[in-house]
A protein has these predicted regions:
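Repeat-based scaffolding regions
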Residues: 1-189
Length: 189
């Protein structure tokens, strides 16, 4: 099959047979190499995106090689920076790999592409949590929670988190303001 593909690159029957053979034998790096060759043989944007996503999936699922999976997805974004499924997959990988700073920027990129206000608020809130819990950046977390509330003033998780941080830091005026905001959105019984 290799010889057939050397003589006729892109010959689909040989390519499919070789994919099956590599998968059956668990020759994942050979399969990735074949896909890499496919990338040099095409200029079609959608084919490149599809091939790079296949490569990323093999690196992640079969080889447990997050750095190479991440690189494949970053290559997709070089071709199509607005490809939302890839942005989300890359975010998932950044989280699995503990690349928190990279994830913050990617969430901002996803929010810009999303266009859905609830999603934007959710991503901003997740960034605030990452700053607080993973990066231990209290000041950054406070600023991020405040940005969430600027987007959605009645967002209960951000109100609670910001209130908690204000209490821990002894910022009583800010805490009073948070309690008032929470009371305004609380249902009356």
């Amino acid at each position: 099959y290799d010889q057939c593909l050397m003589l006729a690159p892109g010959y689909l029957p040989a390519q499919k047979a070789l994919v099956r053979l590599y998968e059956k034998q668990g020759k994942w790096l050979d399969l990735v190499g074949m896909y890499e060759q496919d990338l040099t043989d095409t200029t079609d944007r959608e084919e490149q995106i599809q091939t790079l996503n296949k490569m990323a999936q093999i690196h992640e699922d079969r080889l447990t090689d997050f750095p190479h999976a991440i690189e494949c997805l970053k290559r997709v974004l070089e071709i199509a920076s607005d490809h939302l499924p890839t942005v989300r997959n890359l975010g998932r990988l950044y989280e699995r790999a503990g690349r928190w700073t990279d994830l913050l920027g990617l969430h901002d990129q996803e929010a810009a592409l999303s266009g859905d206000t609830r999603q934007v608020v959710s991503l901003a809130h997740r960034n605030a949590e990452i700053l607080e819990e993973q990066l231990k950046d209290r000041a950054g977390a406070v600023a991020a929670y405040e940005r969430v509330l600027a987007l959605s003033p009645a967002y209960p998780p951000a109100l609670k988190a910001l209130g908690r941080l204000y209490a821990q830091d002894g910022k009583w005026e800010e805490l009073t303001r948070m309690y008032r905001a929470e009371a305004e959105i609380a249902p009356t019984t």
